[in-house]
Amino acid sequence: MAPGKKVAPAPFGAKSTKSNKTRNPLTHSTPKNFGIGQAVQPKRNLSRYVKWPEYVRVQRQKKILSIRLKVPPTIAQFQYTLDRNTAAETFKLFNKYRPETAAEKKERLTKEAAAVAEGKSKQDASPKPYAVKYGLNHVVALIENKKAKLVLIANDVDPIELVVFLPALCKKMGVPYAIVKGKARLGTLVNQKTSAVAALTEVRAEDEAALAKLVSTIDANFADKYDEVKKHWGGGILGNKAQAKMDKRAKNSDSA
């Protein structure tokens, strides 16, 4: 090398292997070996190995099947439910018209009997009762006669064939309808465990405005979109592994 010339520095600075951290000479590092029969294994999520009860397995498989398989539009429409705020307002109105319990009915009949004994009419003792109508056959008859003012349909009825025709029937008869989450929630409206449908036929004068407002909001989400919704199939979504496989295949075909 010619005198006065320096060697060029390395392009990547050599990392110093020395650590400035002072170690306690009394302690020794004991790296763990997680092989079979060695150190205790770290905590992992092992829920996929749990043998779940049959009803849990069935509902999981049903959910996954509904995502994977192609679902016809008539059934796929039940995944589009009423939004939370509108549903809260709707249930608030329906709660005012819950059917009377056995105790309330007994009290009403006692009052009517006392009024009749005094020479009065039944209507004087107790005004006309307004109540939510339920029962599939009963509600279907009300829709066919155009007596229902608002119909709520549960989205998780099993088998779905029981209610799959109701949106089309409501649309044909011009009856406002909404698909809501939970047959159990509908059941609480009518003092039952579950209910597939619930309908209002009459409301008091003070609730007419609230009902009209709800109907206009609900129609915008369901009846007005009916023709559009019945064109769209549901499901057909692959799992993560299948999607990764398809992406890899597409990438290979593009590069070829």
Swiss-Prot record:
GO terms for biological process: cytoplasmic translation; maturation of LSU-rRNA. Keywords: Cytoplasm, Ribonucleoprotein, Ribosomal protein. The lineage of its organism: Eukaryota, Fungi, Dikarya, Ascomycota, Saccharomycotina. This is Large ribosomal subunit protein eL8A. It is found in: Cytoplasm. Residues 16-32 have a biased composition (Polar residues). Belongs to the eukaryotic ribosomal protein eL8 family. Component of the ribosome, a large ribonucleoprotein complex responsible for the synthesis of proteins in the cell. The small ribosomal subunit (SSU) binds messenger RNAs (mRNAs) and translates the encoded message by selecting cognate aminoacyl-transfer RNA (tRNA) molecules. The large subunit (LSU) contains the ribosomal catalytic site termed the peptidyl transferase center (PTC), which catalyzes the formation of peptide bonds, thereby polymerizing the amino acids delivered by tRNAs into a polypeptide chain. It comes from Saccharomyces cerevisiae (strain ATCC 204508 / S288c). Present with 238000 molecules/cell in log phase SD medium. There are 2 genes for eL8 in yeast. The gene is RPL8A. InterPro entries: eL8/uL1-like, Ribosomal_eL30-like_sf, Ribosomal_eL8-like_CS, Ribosomal_eL8/eL30/eS12/Gad45, Ribosomal_eL8/Nhp2, Ribosomal_eL8_euk. One of its GO terms (cellular component) is cytosol.
